A protein has these predicted regions:
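Mixed-charge, low-complexity intrinsically disordered regions
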Residues: 2-81, 87-131
């Protein structure tokens, strides 16, 4: 498993991982991605025309309170709000709404919950490695 928490600060989280599942949503043209980043699992949905990943692809996921540097037309970047912080069942979850699209960060390490507050405005970036 490729996993690395590269940067972790009060306003920035960067994770490296591998896409483990790509599935169709019940909503037309929406795809659900699952990414294993070791200590953190990330699940998110995106419009299929905007982001095309395959099982096995290596990605870097950034969640930041500041607009991250990105390459237009290559990286996927969206912004939204932290709408849920949950701890229970030995797993902490950060839930982010990107104007209807959802990102869920899950980790047994509940320190993840301390990085964000309810209704923080955050940017979500996905960069495919090796492109």
């Amino acid at each position: 498993v490729v996993a690395l928490v590269a940067v972790q600060s009060p306003s920035y989280l960067e994770l490296r991982g591998r896409v483990t599942e790509v599935s169709k949503s019940l909503i037309p043209r929406v795809v659900i991605y699952s990414v294993d980043c070791g200590d953190v699992r990330v699940r998110f949905d995106a419009l299929s025309k905007l982001l095309r990943l395959n099982t096995g692809d290596e990605v870097v996921i950034t969640v930041s309170k500041e607009k991250p540097n990105y390459t237009k037309g290559v990286d996927y970047v969206a912004w939204g709000y932290v709408v849920g912080l949950r701890s229970g069942d030995r797993v902490g979850k950060v839930i982010i709404s990107l104007w209807g699209y959802v990102v869920i960060l899950e980790s047994a390490n509940t320190e993840l919950l301390k990085l964000f507050n309810y209704m923080d405005r955050v940017y979500f970036k996905v960069s495919k490695l090796g492109t």
